[in-house]
């Protein structure tokens, strides 16, 4: 029996992890969400799968994360095998701004600064808080793996190749997350804990009215560097690939920043 805890589990990639893992009745799956009543599909899934447990945990709150870890410990007997840190601050008001858009524009600068602070809290500090809350359980687990969701937009070489100019707070904060993962790996290697950062690829998680145009735009950008790029993955396909990659990684791979395919091909 393998136990998993997934943050940001109410929708998108996080929910896809829960659906995938719940299919194996020998798994014990913990879905961590900010609001336990925010996702009817998750509630329905938990109702039909006794191995799924929904827990409240805002990843910016160390207190809520500690409480969630305590709840997990009560069910598993003090252990956790795999932690997937998926929750993130993705798209703020400044997502469309380039850095040069801020020049001479105090209002945009203020909005950008706020988004960057939210990204620090939601993407960087959240990883520290989440990892620290569950680390005692992970150390006692059998698998001892932590997967932190990153993005190809955190790779400077890729950003230069793609000529990507916007959503700076997200990409910059995820680049910092990759460093946090590397530092954790250095500290945990002697404990046999494998912690890695994986990009899920371009995944079709947005369903708003603007989403189709956004995915078409991004797909065209990526095809300039990789003409064979087929477009966004479904959350289910991305999760399948990431779990396959995670299963192959060992403590010797700790601290690495890889794609869903286990390499540096972000597309």
Locate each region found by the language model.
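Short-chain dehydrogenase/reductase
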Residues: 69, 131, 181, 239-242
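Structural signature of the Rossmann-like NAD(P)-dependent dehydrogenase/reductase core
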Residues: 6-7, 85-86, 145-151, 194-199
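Catalytic loop of short-chain dehydrogenase/reductase
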Residues: 89-135, 139-190, 202-205, 209-212
């Amino acid at each position: 029996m393998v136990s998993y805890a997934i943050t940001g589990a109410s929708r998108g990639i996080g929910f896809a992890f829960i659906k995938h893992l719940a299919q194996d009745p020998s798994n014990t799956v913990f879905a961590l969400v900010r609001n336990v009543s925010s996702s009817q599909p998750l509630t329905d899934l938990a109702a039909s799968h006794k191995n799924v447990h929904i827990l409240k945990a805002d990843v910016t709150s160390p207190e809520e994360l500690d409480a969630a870890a305590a709840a997990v410990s009560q069910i598993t007997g003090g252990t956790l095998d795999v932690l997937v840190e998926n929750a993130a601050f993705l798209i703020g008001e400044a997502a469309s701004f380039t850095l040069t858009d801020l020049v001479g524009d105090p209002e945009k600068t203020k909005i950008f600064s706020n988004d960057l602070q939210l990204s620090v809290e939601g993407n960087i500090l959240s990883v520290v808080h989440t990892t620290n809350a569950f680390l005692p359980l992970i150390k006692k687990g059998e698998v001892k793996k932590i997967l932190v969701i990153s993005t190809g937009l955190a790779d400077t070489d890729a950003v230069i190749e793609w000529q990507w100019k916007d959503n700076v707070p997200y990409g910059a904060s995820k680049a910092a997350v990759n460093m946090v993962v590397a530092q954790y790996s250095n500290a945990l290697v002697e404990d046999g804990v494998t912690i890695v950062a994986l990009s899920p690829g371009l995944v079709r998680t947005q369903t708003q009215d603007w989403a189709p145009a956004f995915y078409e735009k991004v797909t065209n950008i990526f095809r300039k560097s990789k003409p064979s790029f087929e477009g966004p993955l479904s959350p289910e396909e991305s999760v399948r690939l990431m779990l396959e990659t995670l299963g192959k990684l060992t403590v010797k791979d700790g601290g690495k920043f890889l794609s869903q395919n286990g390499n540096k091909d972000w597309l």
